[in-house]
């Protein structure tokens, strides 16, 4: 099974990530890769100038395409577009200590499903008010849920390609209509919780996918130091 991480210094965005140094985040990624069970084929998708950080601890390095930052999840969708078949993409602050149990009879799986907060729901309303429904119709479907993308599992190339197509169209709409007017990226406000995490559920509702959750099957097999837990880890560790 291929287990993939995505890293670029250019994607250290957001208030919480900006508190942590580049060096600390790089060490988190290195620890995540080293600690992951050896049964996985370990792959890093990264910039050419950071290959040396990972080349000795992975089985394969894929050089990142030099695309402009739009959403925090861009790197994951970029590498998912390059790889076919069955694979997992993992966050760099997610420590896998045992082989993961995969959901069965699914087309794809993610870490867990949750309910969007008012900020994220507000972002969706902005998309709708600016007319995304005519360009990317899946956004018209009523929905307040999202999928956390800390873990992403794919095994259906056809559905994966359809999901990525919707993601690309959402990116294009955002850069054409949203960023010039609202300047979320310029002001370091992360739209990705809507445009990528909520997008997955919008896609699911329109394509009748079979989506599984890692969280409910793997409670003791990984720890995700996401959000503020990443900052707590800085205080507790000498990584």
Which positions does each model-derived feature cover?
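Active-site regions of enzymes building and remodeling cell-envelope glycoconjugates
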Residues: 54-68, 86-88, 103-110, 223
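Short beta-strand-to-loop element that shapes/binds the nucleotide-sugar donor at the catalytic cleft/hinge
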Residues: 108-141
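N-terminal anchoring/stem segment of glycosyltransferases
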Residues: 1-66, 226-239
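Short, polar loop motifs at secondary-structure junctions
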Residues: 45-52, 92-99, 217
């Amino acid at each position: 099974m291929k287990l993939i991480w995505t890293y670029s210094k250019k994607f250290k965005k957001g208030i919480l990530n900006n508190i942590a140094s580049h060096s600390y985040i790089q060490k988190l990624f290195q620890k995540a890769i080293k600690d992951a069970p050896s049964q996985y084929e370990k792959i890093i998708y990264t910039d050419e100038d950071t290959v040396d950080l990972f080349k000795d601890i992975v089985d394969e390095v894929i050089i990142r395409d030099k695309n402009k930052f739009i959403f925090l999840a861009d790197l994951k969708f970029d590498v998912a577009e390059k790889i076919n078949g069955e694979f997992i993409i993992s966050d760099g602050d997610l420590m896998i200590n045992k082989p993961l149990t995969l959901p069965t009879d699914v087309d794809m799986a993610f870490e867990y499903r949750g309910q969007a907060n008012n900020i994220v729901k507000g972002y969706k309303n902005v998309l709708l008010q600016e007319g995304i429904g005519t360009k990317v119709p899946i956004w018209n479907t009523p929905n307040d849920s999202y999928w956390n993308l800390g873990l992403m599992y794919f095994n259906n190339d056809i559905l994966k390609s359809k999901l990525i197509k919707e993601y690309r169209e959402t990116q294009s709409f955002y850069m054409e209509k949203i960023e010039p007017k609202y300047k979320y990226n310029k002001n370091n406000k992360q739209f990705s919780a809507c445009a990528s995490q909520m997008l997955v559920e919008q896609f699911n509702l329109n394509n009748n996918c079979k989506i599984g959750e890692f969280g409910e099957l793997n409670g003791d097999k990984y720890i995700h130091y996401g959000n503020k837990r990443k900052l707590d880890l800085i205080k507790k560790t000498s990584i």
